[in-house]
Amino acid sequence: MGDTLEYTEEEAQQEESTFKTPAAIARRQLVREKLDFQPDDDVLSIGCGPGFEPAEIAEDICQNGHIHAIDQSEAMLTLAERRCSSTSNITLSRADAVALPFADESFDAAVAVQVYEYIEDLDTALAELARVLRPGGRAVVYDTDFDSLVWHATDQERMRAICEAFNDHCPRPHLGSQLAPHLRDVGLTVEQVEPNSILNTRLDEDTFVYHLMEAIKTYVVSRGKITANVATAWVNDLRETDADRETFFNLTQYLYVVQKPTE
């Protein structure tokens, strides 16, 4: 992870655990509700990760529809293959969002959840999304603005330093609040923008904040951004805060419903 969508095997497994949390499950359900898939839809899942997204979309469409799920990470695709191998109308492939290997107007719907914040060449990637949608086709684009983060810790100065060090894990950490003009520039109509806040008040292992904490620690230490001692002290502080029942974490992400005009 970093300025690329590639993951190590360890990072992919860590991310898979995050996808199992109630917050991630609710997010995927929200995305599916917004797109209201039809039984014969051809759907593109951009950045399918460990495969939860295409597997769940397959439950919404019948065998007349098909899901093409792509990811740039071999480690993620390995996990997705395990999850989707028994579903005949899912095709998994390694591909880049800035050069989608599909013909023009191939899809009725598309999903890209926390993908574009990791892409340097954003406008090319969004133009590719618009290109492969059929006229009238719809998509959900969903990204985070890390400026929205509220995370209580005893040592807020250390918290700020660690969060700032983590901000470069993607090229566009504030994209969630900046997407609309980019989407319009490639000819897509923005029909709805909706915030989705992830709120955790406990640091249990099934919470989003727990897995984000672990991912941040791994990232900032492995990249030499923060020393192991400082990162460990940060985690210990969060655990002590939780023991005192004072955990408070809130991160707002933004869901954009877009459509390709029919004319």
Features from the language model and the residues they span:
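A short SAM/SAH-binding and catalytic strip from SAM-dependent methyltransferases
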Residues: 108-121
